[in-house]
Amino acid sequence: MSFFHKLSVWIRSNFFIPDARALWIKPSVKHLLKYLEENPVDAIFSDGPPHSNTRIATLIKQKTGIPWLADFQDPWTQVDYYQLLRLTSFGDRKHRRMEFEAFTAADKTTIVSPTWKGDLELLGAKNVSVIPWGYDPEDFKKLEPVSRPDQL
């Protein structure tokens, strides 16, 4: 890795927390709070990464109390590349604080792996379910082949 690549990773990791979309958070929360005043909803759903989505949902949940389902396609601080982010102790603490706030605010949390489910629960996530990636072959057994005359 070049010096400039290492520097860019360090800047991104320590100044744009939780991720490169961090600048979306404040304006998104402001817009969504105004939107929700005029358009009430029964629940909030967020999907991350990017964890800026999770942070936005955390703040909306904290300010409104609307039930929230937090979906994680990958863990936050437990993801395998987290140690490669070259975080300062301040950056690491901020990531972990945001992660903990999300886990304790969410009414329901989903993740794609049973192993990660245990990791999230150890970090404070409650009411965690696993929704694995993939498909169920049983869903496709009764399908008939389709001819595609437009293909070779």
Features from the language model and the residues they span:
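A short helix->loop->beta-strand "cap" motif at the edges of active sites that frequently abuts
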Residues: T64-P67, A125-N127
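Short His-centered aromatic/hydrophobic patch
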Residues: D47-H51
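Membrane-proximal helix-turn-helix segments that form the acceptor-binding/catalytic region
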Residues: D19, S52-R55, L59-K63, W76-T77, ...
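Acidic anion/phosphate-binding donor-loop and adjacent secondary structure
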Residues: Y135-P149
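Carbohydrate-associated surface elements
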Residues: T115, W133-G134
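Conserved nucleotide-sugar donor-binding subdomain of glycosyltransferases
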Residues: M1-A43, D92-R96
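A short, histidine- and acid-enriched strand-loop-helix "catalytic/donor-clamping" loop
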Residues: P27-L33, S52-N53, I66, A70-T88, ...
